Amino acid sequence: NKNDFRWDLTLQASTFKNEITSLPSPFINGSKRWDVGRSRFDFFLLRTAGVDPDTGDQLFFVYEQDDNGNSVPVLDANGNQETTNDWQDTERAYTGDSSIPDLLGSISNSFSYKGFTLDVLITYGIGGSVLDNAYAGMMHSGNYGSSWHPDILNAWKQPGDITNVPRLENGNVNLVRTQSERFLTDATFWSLKNASLGYNFDKKFIERFGLNDLRLYVTGENLYLNSERTGLDPQYNLAGTPPGDDFTPPRIVSLGLNVSF
């Protein structure tokens, strides 16, 4: 019976832009550089150029600062941008990435059929980038008592290896620079934020027991998250720089009974 079925759908989507209009002088704020005419969420990092297949060194594109403090690429005689294996021989530069999602919103569904109800809330974000500090912390070049990410198995091992993970050298902090675009990750995600399934018992049935209403339900929160990398939760940090030691909200499942006399 179609008259017993109801479906309510609510779609929400939002986006926003920002621009710094006044500032005494530009300055670096963490992974960003604030300057007039730019967004405060534009990433300003070391630009990486892959891994040297001969040595396993992390390579960086070379930039230098002009008279206005802006980073400009350094070119060789052939017009190609120079690279270096020493991050101290270059400057940070804008990567062209922002931590602001292109679209942020939710999809709410509410179904009812006779005594059954089902409510589902999905949240999502499309676009934007996040500097994955947790991942960077597990891609170190070798520190005693620290865990590694499985991607460390892709590290350079011998001349000729083509990989984006530099060689391992215990204690050499110069091989891994967290403030580099190597650890920029797509912040797109979708999450099954909440789902609730319930049943309202028939009035005639429950009146036999002296009840006015009887409802049984099961509810789940933070049930599923899909993001670019397992464990990465871009939902709660608009700056795109989660500290790496934070915890995402736990998955909660609860069973309930509402009784009205």
Please name every model-derived segment:
Residues N1-S99:
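Conserved small-residue
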Residues D8-T10, S106-S108, N194-G198, S254-G256:
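Membrane-embedded beta-strand positions in outer-membrane beta-barrel channels/transporters
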